[in-house]
Structure formats: structure tokens, C-alpha cells
């Protein structure tokens, strides 16, 4: 589809008063989406790194703090009413989000995907299977 088309789609959705929550991977994308009227800009740090199928390479949490702040600053440089959320990469657990949110300004929260639906299920399934595997028969 291409990012230009995504920006245009956000612009059209905004004209129809639809809620828009596009990802921005860098400052230029944040500026473009803010200009298009995005309600929420998700500062995306890449594929989630935790879990059984998580990405093997990503930014560190410390690097994510800097990048999320840069994206937030870029978005707010265009429109100060845009909501900015952090997401992805090493920001997978509540404590990860807390780490980023406590060290950034004008970042309003966390946008969950794998961290809300995949990771908790992986944990629960793994624990349940381990419990079944631990069953021992009396001899």
C-alpha cells in the first residue's frame, strides 16, 4: 500500500470523523500523520521482542525512550492536541511501558498488541502444559 497511501487514508478517515491510530516509525512519519489529522500517533519501536516468536533484534528500552520522545516531539510540533502512545520492540511488559513513560514527556500511554493478546496467552499455555507434564502416576 505504501506510507503515502496510509497518510491519505488517515486524512480521509479524519474528514469522516473516524478515530485514527496510525503507526509512526520515525519523526517524518509522525509529522505527516499529525498533519493528516491523526487522533493518536503510535510511536512504533518495531516488532515485539519478547515471547516465543518475538523479534531477535530491536532497540533497547533506553534507545526506545529517545526515539519515542523524538516521535512525540515531532508530532506535537505539528499539532499539540495529538495523543502519542508508545508501542513495540522491547516495550512488551507493563514494567517496560512504565520505564518509557516515566522518562518521556507528552507521551500519553501504551498501545498494546502482542503484549496484550499473544504474550499472556503464551505464558498461560506454557504454564498449563508444564502442569500437565508434571503429572506423575502412583506406582
Regions found by a protein language model. Give the residues of each.
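Alpha-helix-loop-beta-strand connector modules within alpha/beta enzyme cores
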Residues: 1-25, 56-84, 103-104, 130-139
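Hydrophobic faces of well-ordered beta-strands that scaffold small-molecule active sites
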Residues: 20-22, 41-43, 82-88, 108-112
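Active-site rim beta-loop-alpha module in soluble metabolic enzymes
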Residues: 24-65
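Catalytic cores of alpha/beta
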Residues: 26-37, 86-107
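Conserved, mostly hydrophobic/aromatic
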Residues: 33, 41, 71, 100, ...
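Glycine-rich phosphate-binding active-site loops on the catalytic face of alpha/beta enzymes
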Residues: 40-57, 103-128
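Short, well-ordered coil↔helix boundary/capping segments
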Residues: 58-65, 90-94, 119
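C-terminal functional extensions of proteins
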Residues: 94-96, 109-116, 133-139
Amino acid at each position: 500500500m505504501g506510507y503515502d497511501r496510509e497518510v491519505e487514508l488517515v486524512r480521509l478517515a479524519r474528514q469522516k470523523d473516524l478515530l485514527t491510530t496510525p503507526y509512526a516509525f520515525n519523526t517524518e512519519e509522525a509529522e505527516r500523520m499529525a498533519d493528516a489529522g491523526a487522533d493518536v500517533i503510535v510511536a512504533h519501536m518495531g516488532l515485539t521482542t519478547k515471547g516465543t516468536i518475538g523479534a531477535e533484534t530491536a532497540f533497547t528500552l533506553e534507545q526506545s525512550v529517545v526515539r519515542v520522545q523524538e516521535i512525540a516531539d515531532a508530532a506535537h510540533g505539528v499539532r499539540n492536541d495529538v495523543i502519542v502512545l508508545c508501542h513495540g520492540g522491547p516495550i512488551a511488559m507493563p514494567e517496560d511501558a512504565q520505564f518509557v513513560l516515566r522518562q518521556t514527556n507528552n507521551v500519553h500511554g501504551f498501545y498494546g498488541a502482542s503484549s496484550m493478546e499473544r504474550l499472556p496467552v503464551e505464558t498461560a499455555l506454557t504454564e498449563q502444559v508444564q502442569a500437565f507434564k508434571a503429572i506423575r502416576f502412583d506406582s
